[in-house]
């Protein structure tokens, strides 16, 4: 019989291998030669596991390797290596000669970055795979034999379980193996199937197909190598040497077949007899085993009873210990309580004495309190009078403050809510160097009058609220504007803006320089000073925002990215206007305000033209929000101050701008014109005020109308070169103020008239373009009027609701008056109750005195009772001591019982060991007798076979006998292997086929030499007989399964395994299969 060879490179467990095996090919334990004994141990189990691992491979030369590819495993015979789904960059950089993954049909690519355990020197191979039902076609190969290696790794279902991915691998449309990677090596571990032999025909094609059984197949790499040439062993022929002439006599095939048939029949008879004996011995062993199990069960029962008794004894010990501890704790508590009560009695005596002293003191204090009650009533009355005076003063102060605000704002209104101040700058260095003439007359500046020489000594005069000469400084200018600041703190909206042509000093007036501050800085400074003066009565919260209107677009100058979002004007529910998303900086002092102003001025849009190199091309607007809360009455106000530095207003012809600058100038002039229209409509109290004609006026809507106050600085130039712009600025200011003084009539200059006509024509052209925009605005106005009508309807409905609410308020007011009358009556009744309570207080004082006397008597009685309790507790302690003595006697008795039980347990253990030793000796003797009988029978069978069936060998020499027996035994062993041995591996099958092929070749050669024709096929009737004679297999192993018969075998016989059992170390249960009526030993 051939020995089973197991590869050491496949250390897999039995559970993982059995899941990979096909249900048609179950696994069995291995059986060695007939003369070898089978023993139970770790080595036999490991051999079985390895054999089951290799049973999944059809090719006996192939093997499974649970580690990755290494440099030492590389060979020069590699023809092609394909990394399935691999990255081209890793493929080119690797040491392997890896081909591109272009030979597949179907499937998907999957890659992972997880580390692969034991991946060898090329771990990237197992980090990519092809998944799905697919195939590979390797073409352009030379005919011959090749070796294919498959690289697998489970990188998808890393948490299992076993059997979640099972698939078949077909090579040249023949099933090679059935895989479950996770059950063999687990997740993120490589598994290699190497040395799979494949034959390439003339078409030069190898087709590898992957087909899923459960889940999708997965492969990481395919390696194709040249197959080494296998040397064919020489076949030996069967001959017999003669004793006399030493010639080799060939045995004919027919005679050899007859000899084998006879030996086969005799061996079958002997095997039947041995199988009967074997069944008889197994029955005896089964009975012995049943008796052993019953003895073990009795022993277990005794042990259980013994354990219960030991547990009861231990529980009794624990209860006794716990009770003893309880007694000790009770005695300790008694001693502690005794000490505690002694100390408590002493403390009570001390407290009684202290209470007596306190009682005397309280009685004295009670007399003093009774005497001091009239004085307390007088003091309460005085305090109430002071509180009422304080409340009257607060009310008068709030009324006086409101009147002061009204008077102050009335004075400001008498001066005009819309006030216009005119300021003229001095001549600059360029104008003085060219000796430019001054056209402004400041003779009536104190009265607010101003004269402008227009030409031909004609003079045009204007009147404003205040006129500043070039000699007036920033302090003089702010002195007239400072009253407006107080109005902001009183809750009014104020707007201060500077208007004029480019280069007239608007920015200087509003912002100034660090050495000479402007209106903006001085206004905020005064806001903080007044707020600091009023901090005891009013709290203020001031926030600042800086923005600009550039080309009719609002830009936030404090935002980090001004152009990132578009800002729009929204109207809130209370009617005020605000810009959502605008940055508001909360400021606490003037330094923070200056930093905010500097940041806004640096971000402002500036451009150059013919008039000024640094002309402001946008309207810079500083918004100051003031929130005030009156700490006296809780009134809250919210006001807004706008400080606006308007862009330069100049004529387009003079600036000579084009492109983007022309668009900027047109937008500036349009917004300034809209501002003039709004202010003029406010001054004339027009029914419609066009706030929405420009973003500038729309922003200033809250600070231009209603109770708001407006101050305008008109900036002019004294130079004769700027006379037209100066007149246009003064006309605009006069239009704003609503007062225009007629000019002194003198001789008219015709040249000037012609210039004016040309300007009129240009104005007409501009007006045409404006008319178109006006039409669009009218359409928008009509739409707004439709919306206003809807709002009017809603307003009417709200008015009706207000009337209903007023009626409800009247009814509630009447009810409150009635409740007030009821409350007055209740107050009178409460006064009467207070007088009654005073009388009750006196009565309670008398009762207190009586209670003190009774309590002192009761305390004395309690002290006596406590002394009696102490005496009783001393008596109870004696009783507890007697109980402790009784418990100690019981403990001694229980200890004696426990010693008796221990002695009985020892006796039982000695008896149990004696019985076990006797039974083990009997079983060993029986097993040895069975082994001796089997050996004798085997020797007897061999002697009978040699003497009866081969008489011609008796006269041969020893060498001839050896050769003859070798040849005959070779055939007999083949027959026995075909009939008696269970195959457990595909390797044994292939080796069996090789031996059969060699026999057939020898027969053919002998037939060709002798010229005789023989029928080498087996008789089908014999096969049927052999199958009928064979009994069902009886296998004594860990797992019992049916097996697939080998291709060359006709029947199978059972094989018994002998095992040595150590009863002292382990207990083996007995299992009976009642349906098949077989008795089987299983571990």
From Swiss-Prot:
| Coiled-coil zones | 264-418, 746-876, 905-947
Keywords carried by this UniProt record: ATP-binding, Coiled coil, Microtubule, Motor protein, Nucleotide-binding
Q: Where does ATP bind?
A: 500-507
Positions with biased composition (Basic and acidic residues): 1020-1032, 1062-1083
Q: Region Disordered: what ranges?
A: 967-1083
Query: Which terms in the GO cellular component ontology are assigned?
Result: microtubule; nucleus
List all membrane-crossing ranges: none
The residues forming the signal peptide are none
Any one GO MF annotation of this record: microtubule motor activity
Q: Name one GO biological process term.
A: microtubule-based movement
Q: Where in the numbering of this chain does the Kinesin motor domain appear?
A: 417-739
Where do Polar residues bias regions lie?
971-985, 1044-1054
Highest taxon, organism lineage? Eukaryota
Q: Which PROSITE patterns match?
A: KINESIN_MOTOR_1 (PS00411), KINESIN_MOTOR_2 (PS50067)
Per the record, the similarity remark reads: Belongs to the TRAFAC class myosin-kinesin ATPase superfamily. Kinesin family. KIN-14 subfamily.
Q: Which PANTHER family match?
A: KINESIN-LIKE PROTEIN KIN-14R, KINESIN-LIKE PROTEIN KLP-3
This chain belongs to the protein called Kinesin-like protein KIN-14R
Q: Which organism is it from?
A: Arabidopsis thaliana (Mouse-ear cress)
């Amino acid at each position: 019989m051939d020995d089973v060879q197991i590869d050491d490179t496949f250390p897999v467990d039995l559970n993982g291998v059995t899941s990979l095996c096909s249900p048609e090919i179950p696994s069995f334990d291995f059986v060695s030669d007939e003369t070898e004994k089978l023993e139970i141990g770790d080595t036999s189990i490991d051999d079985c596991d390895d054999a089951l691992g290799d049973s999944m491979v059809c090719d006996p030369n192939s093997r499974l390797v649970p580690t990755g590819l290494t440099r030492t495993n590389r060979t020069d015979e590699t023809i092609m290596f394909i990394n399935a789904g691999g990255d081209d960059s890793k493929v080119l950089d690797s040491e392997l000669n890896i081909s591109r993954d272009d030979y597949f049909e179907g499937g998907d690519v999957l890659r992972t970055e997880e580390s692969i355990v034991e991946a060898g020197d090329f771990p990237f191979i197992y980090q990519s795979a092809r998944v799905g039902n697919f195939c590979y076609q390797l073409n352009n190969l030379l005919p011959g034999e090749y070796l294919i290696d498959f690289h697998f790794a489970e990188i998808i279902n890393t948490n299992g379980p076993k059997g979640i991915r099972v698939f078949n691998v077909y090579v040249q449309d023949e099933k090679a193996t059935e895989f479950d990677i996770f059950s063999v090596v687990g997740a993120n571990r490589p598994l290699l199937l190497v040395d799979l032999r494949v034959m390439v025909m003339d078409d030069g094609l190898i087709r590898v197909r992957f087909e899923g059984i459960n889940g999708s197949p997965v492969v990481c790499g395919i390696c194709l190598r040249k197959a080494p040439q296998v040397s064919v062993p020489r076949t030996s022929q069967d001959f017999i040497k003669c004793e006399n002439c030493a010639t080799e006599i060939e045995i004919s095939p027919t005679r050899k077949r007859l000899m084998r048939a006879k030996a086969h029949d005799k061996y079958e008879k002997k095997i039947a007899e041995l199988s009967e004996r074997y069944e008889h011995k197994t029955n005896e062993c089964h009975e012995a085993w049943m008796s052993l199990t019953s003895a073990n069960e009795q022993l277990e029962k005794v042990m259980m009873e013994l354990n219960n008794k030991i547990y009861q004894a231990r529980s009794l010990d624990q209860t006794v210990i716990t009770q003893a501890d309880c007694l000790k704790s009770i005695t300790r508590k008694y001693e502690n309580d005794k000490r505690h009560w002694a100390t408590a009695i002493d403390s009570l005596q001390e407290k009684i004495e202290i209470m007596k002293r306190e009682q005397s003191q309280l009685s004295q204090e009670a007399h003093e309190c009774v005497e001091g009650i009239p004085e307390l009533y007088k003091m309460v009355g005085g305090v109430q009078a002071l509180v009422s005076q304080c409340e009257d003063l607060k009310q008068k102060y709030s009324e006086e403050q409101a009147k002061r605000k009204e008077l102050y704002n009335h004075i400001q209104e008498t001066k005009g809510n819309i006030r216009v101040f005119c300021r003229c700058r001095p001549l600059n260095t360029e104008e003085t160097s060219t000796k430019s003439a001054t056209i402004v007359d400041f003779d009536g500046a104190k009265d607010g009058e101003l004269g402008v020489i227009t030409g031909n000594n004609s003079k045009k005069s204007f009147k404003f609220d205040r006129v500043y000469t070039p000699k007036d400084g920033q302090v003089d200018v702010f002195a007239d504007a400072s009253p407006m600041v107080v109005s902001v703190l009183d809750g009014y909206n104020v707007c201060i803006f500077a208007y004029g042509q480019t280069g007239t000093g608007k920015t200087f007036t509003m912002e100034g320089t660090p050495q000479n501050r402007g209106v903006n800085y001085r206004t905020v400074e005064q806001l903080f000073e007044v707020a600091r003066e009023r901090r005891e009565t009013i709290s203020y919260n001031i926030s600042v925002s800086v923005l600009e209107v550039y080309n009719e677009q609002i830009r936030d100058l404090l935002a980090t990215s001004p152009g990132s979002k578009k800002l729009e004007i929204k109207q809130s529910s209370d009617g005020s206007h605000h810009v959502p998303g605008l940055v508001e900086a909360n400021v606490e002092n003037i330094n923070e305000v200056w930093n905010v102003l500097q940041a806004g001025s640096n971000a402002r849009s500036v451009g150059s033209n013919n008039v000024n190199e640094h002309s402001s091309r946008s309207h810079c607007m500083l918004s100051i929000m003031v929130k005030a809360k009156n700490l006296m009455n809780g009134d809250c106000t919210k006001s807004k101050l706008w400080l606006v530095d308007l862009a330069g207003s100049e004529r387009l012809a003079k600036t000579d701008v084009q492109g983007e600058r022309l668009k900027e100038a047109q937008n500036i002039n349009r917004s300034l014109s809209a501002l003039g229209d709004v202010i003029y409509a406010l001054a004339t109290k027009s029914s419609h005020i066009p706030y929405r004609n420009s973003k500038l006026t729309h922003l200033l809507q809250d600070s231009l109308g209603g109770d708001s106050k407006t101050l305008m600085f008109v900036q002019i130039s004294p130079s004769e070169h700027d006379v037209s712009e100066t007149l246009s600025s003064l006309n605009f200011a006069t239009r704003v103020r609503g007062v225009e003084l007629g000019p002194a009539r003198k001789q008219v200059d015709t040249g000037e008239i012609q210039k004016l006509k040309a300007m009129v024509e240009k104005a007409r052209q501009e007006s045409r373009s404006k008319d178109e925009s006006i039409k669009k605005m009218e359409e928008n106005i009509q739409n707004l009027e439709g919306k206003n009508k809807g709002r009017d309807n809603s307003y009417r409905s709200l008015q009706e609701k207000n009337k209903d609410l007023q009626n409800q308020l009247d009814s509630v007011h009447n009810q409150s008056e009635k409740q007030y009358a009821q409350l007055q009556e209740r107050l009178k009744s409460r006064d009467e109750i207070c007088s009654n309570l005073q009388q009750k207080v006196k009565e309670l004082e008398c009762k207190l005195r009586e209670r003190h006397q009774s309590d002192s008597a009761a305390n004395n009685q309690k002290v006596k009772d406590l002394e009696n309790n102490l005496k009783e507790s001393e008596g109870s302690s004696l009783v507890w001591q007697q109980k402790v003595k009784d418990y100690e006697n019981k403990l001694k008795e229980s200890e004696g019982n426990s010693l008796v039980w221990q002695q009985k347990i020892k006796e039982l253990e000695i008896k149990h060991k004696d019985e076990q030793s006797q039974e083990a000796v009997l079983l060993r003797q029986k097993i040895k007798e069975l082994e001796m009988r089997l050996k004798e029978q085997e020797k007897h069978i061999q002697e009978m076979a040699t003497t009866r069936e081969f008489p011609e060998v008796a006269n041969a020499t020893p060498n001839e006998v050896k050769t003859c027996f070798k040849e005959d035994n070779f055939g007999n062993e083949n027959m026995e292997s075909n009939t008696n041995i269970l195959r457990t591996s595909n390797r044994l099958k292939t080796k069996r086929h090789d031996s059969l092929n060699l026999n057939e070749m020898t027969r053919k050669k002998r037939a060709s030499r002798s010229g005789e024709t023989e029928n080498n096929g087996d008789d089908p009737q014999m096969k049927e007989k052999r199958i009928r004679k064979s009994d069902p297999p009886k296998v004594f192993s860990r797992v019992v399964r049916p097996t697939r018969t080998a291709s060359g075998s006709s029947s199978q016989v059972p094989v018994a395994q002998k095992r040595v059992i150590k009863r002292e170390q382990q207990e083996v249960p007995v299992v009976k299969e009642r349906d098949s009526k077989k008795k089987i030993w299983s571990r």
